[in-house]
Amino acid sequence: MLPYVTHDPRFSQLVIGHANLEKLASGCRWAEGPAYFAAGRYLVWSDIPNDRMMRFDETDASVSVFRSPSFNSNGNTADREGRLVSCEQFMRHVTRTEHDGSITVLADRHDGRRLNSP
């Protein structure tokens, strides 16, 4: 028996038969937007209501706060150079976290108007 319920049979095509679910962290109120960084062997995700981003380090199974405040980040991904790209709802822009930890705003306007919670 699977440790989860599926509502669409197509989901089974996405799951590797021998893969196991593993709880990585607790205390998140709304965890979403995972982005995996293979070179660093870590996973980053957003905990939107707690206004933070979390990080799971695969090498030692530790969980830590990656960024707080996160400005209600969401929609995370890794770019081709291994940098984090996020949509920050509160600040209404799309950012990139550089390798040195600095943050670059990639977009905050379209047609001269502010983005609306990207």
Sequence positions of predicted segments:
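Sequence-structural signature of mature extracellular/luminal beta-sheet repeat domains
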Residues: M1-P118
